UniProtKB/Swiss-Prot annotation:
GO biological process: photorespiration; reductive pentose-phosphate cycle
Keywords: Acetylation, Calvin cycle, Carbon dioxide fixation, Chloroplast, Lyase, Methylation, Monooxygenase, Oxidoreductase, Photorespiration, Photosynthesis, Plastid
Subunit details: Heterohexadecamer of 8 large chains and 8 small chains.
Gene Ontology CC entries for this record: chloroplast
Function: RuBisCO catalyzes two reactions: the carboxylation of D-ribulose 1,5-bisphosphate, the primary event in carbon dioxide fixation, as well as the oxidative fragmentation of the pentose substrate in the photorespiration process. Both reactions occur simultaneously and in competition at the same active site.
Homology family: Belongs to the RuBisCO large chain family. Type I subfamily.
Chain positions with N6,N6,N6-trimethyllysine modification: K12
Organism: Capsicum annuum (Capsicum pepper)
Major localization listed first in the record, in broad terms: plastid
Stated name of the protein: Ribulose bisphosphate carboxylase large chain
EC class name: lyase
Subcellular location per the Swiss-Prot or TrEMBL entry: Plastid, Chloroplast
Residues modified to N-acetylproline: P1
Gene Ontology molecular-function annotations: monooxygenase activity; ribulose-bisphosphate carboxylase activity
Length: 16
């Protein structure tokens, strides 16, 4: 999706 939710951002941050 174009708009990434905070959950998505947090998920990516957690993955890294």
């Amino acid at each position: 999706p174009q708009t990434e939710t905070k959950a998505s951002v947090g998920f990516k941050a957690g993955v890294k």
